[in-house]
């Protein structure tokens, strides 16, 4: 379990609120399953409106890290500290709806938040517009494409008005055109709402143009920086050969 001194954490949260609009800081995070170390010595921070991509191979710890940040996995040591009152929305990598649930896109989007949103139609309208799903609201969820499903899940995250959205491999099932559309939408969301977006990927080519910052992990962080810094210091082949060497 995570062992955090409460007084230290509260003091740190107060500092976090006053430094560079920072929403998240991770200190010395480590995590193991069945005695096998999955993550070690993870240190990072995130500011409001940032789009950060955690890049790494399958099995490198990306999903374990974002689940820890989202509060789903608490079996870690170290500190994960969020700015006070930070709201998180999390979109898992694998999400499916039962064939026994024939529901519309509109119902799926609004059901969980209807009571909160019924007096604020502007949030609903803006979310649908930002996610670009206005033309599929009456469709059955089971009938829409993989790319449209991801946009629907993104809209469901967004409608909760979060400060931080965590996306685990959000474009893995999409073709190149759907990926470009998805990344364009998250850039608009980050700018319009000043939402911080943390996503995972194993595809550097897709991640680079859409990220403010890249963190490369394979159980630990071995490179990080702005996209141009990553590319200036390492070629694609060097980056992925270093994954394979670990």
Curated annotation (Swiss-Prot):
Membrane topology qualifier: Peripheral membrane protein
Entry EC number(s): 7.2.2.20
GO MF entry, a single one: ATP binding
Enzyme class, UniProt record, top EC level: translocase
Keywords from the named record: ATP-binding, Cell membrane, Ion transport, Membrane, Nucleotide-binding, Translocase, Transport, Zinc, Zinc transport
Positions with a binding annotation for ATP: 56-63
Keyword NAD annotated: no
Entry keyword annotation includes Membrane: yes
Record field: catalytic activity: Zn(2+)(out) + ATP(in) + H2O(in) = Zn(2+)(in) + ADP(in) + phosphate(in) + H(+)(in)
Localization: Cell membrane
Highest taxon in the source lineage: Bacteria
Pfam hit, one: ABC_tran
Domain ABC transporter, chain residue ranges per copy: 24-243
InterPro entries: AAA+_ATPase (IPR003593), ABC_transporter-like_ATP-bd (IPR003439), Metal_Ion_Import_ABC (IPR050153), P-loop_NTPase (IPR027417)
Biological role: Part of the ABC transporter complex ZnuABC involved in zinc import. Responsible for energy coupling to the transport system.
Subunit structure, as described in the record: The complex is composed of two ATP-binding proteins (ZnuC), two transmembrane proteins (ZnuB) and a solute-binding protein (ZnuA).
PANTHER family in alphabetical order: METAL TRANSPORT SYSTEM ATP-BINDING PROTEIN TM_0124-RELATED
Name the record gives this protein: Zinc import ATP-binding protein ZnuC
Species, as recorded: Wolbachia pipientis wMel
């Amino acid at each position: 379990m995570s062992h955090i001194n409460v007084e230290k954490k509260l003091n740190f949260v107060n500092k976090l609120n006053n430094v560079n609009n920072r929403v998240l800081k991770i200190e010395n995070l480590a995590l193991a399953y069945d005695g096998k170390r999955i993550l070690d010595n993870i240190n990072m921070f995130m500011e409001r409106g940032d789009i950060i991509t955690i890049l790494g191979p399958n099995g490198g710890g990306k999903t374990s890290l974002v689940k820890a940040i989202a509060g789903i996995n608490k079996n870690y040591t170290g500190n994960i500290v969020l700015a006070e009152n930070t709201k998180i929305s999390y979109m898992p990598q694998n999400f499916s709806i039962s064939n026994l649930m024939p529901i519309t896109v509109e119902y799926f989007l609004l059901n969980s938040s209807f009571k909160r949103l019924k007096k604020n139609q502007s949030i609903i309208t803006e979310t649908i517009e930002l996610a670009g799903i206005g033309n599929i609201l009456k469709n059955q969820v089971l009938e829409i494409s993989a790319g449209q499903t991801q946009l629907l899940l993104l809209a469901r995250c967004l409608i909760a008005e979060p400060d931080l959205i965590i996306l685990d491999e959000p474009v893995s099932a999409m073709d190149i055109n759907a990926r470009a559309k998805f990344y364009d939408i998250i850039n608009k969301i980050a700018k319009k709402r000043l939402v911080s977006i943390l996503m995972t990927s194993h595809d550097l080519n897709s991640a680079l143009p859409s990220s403010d910052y890249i963190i490369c992990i394979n159980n630990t962080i071995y490179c990080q920086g702005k996209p141009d810094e990553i590319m200036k210091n390492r070629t694609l082949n060097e980056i992925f050969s270093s994954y394979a060497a670990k």
